[in-house]
Curated annotation (Swiss-Prot):
Topological domains, Extracellular: 50-56
Keyword vocabulary terms for this entry: Cell membrane, Membrane, Protein transport, Translocation, Transmembrane, Transmembrane helix, Transport
GO annotation (BP), single: protein transport
Location(s) in or outside the cell: Cell membrane
Identification of the protein by name: Preprotein translocase subunit SecG
Amino acid sequence: MAKEKTTLPPTGAGLMRFFDEDTRAIKITPKGAVALTLILIIFEIILHVVGPRIFG
């Protein structure tokens, strides 16, 4: 009789996992990124309108 061949699940078959290690970078949620972007856009608009009066 032939031996039964056991196979491993294909989920991790030699693929690199990029998120296994914890990095020391700043972690921000997608909502936080959108909020910071909107704040930056509003700040730029305010500087564009009011800036010439303040900075000459």
